[in-house]
């Protein structure tokens, strides 16, 4: 997991996401990805859930790096195996709000929530992250107003 986090950080640095964007813009991206996760859950779409869990984690690694925090430790969780009654989306939304309110200092409850969602859907958390990284590792694009826009979306309108 540590190597995967380092690859994500390097990918973000190569695309100027660390210094060329802001934590606030990355948090908006995190909310976008979390919205996709909620859509996947509401549709019981396992592929969308897996993709979104990984995407949320990738954005959190980037955000963590932007605020100067070491991403070490994000890989040292010992996650349980909750059932659906132990997990609610509103708890993660609350954790996301706390994460932003406290200057992005406390990513762990959000990461734990993402891991719990993976467990509920019998997904391997690290596989979710690996899939997300493999999807973005060769992605090209450009920074526009502090937001990385992937090459495929550069010609799209209002997407």
Model-derived segments and spans:
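Flexible "arm" and connector segments at domain edges
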Residues: 1-159
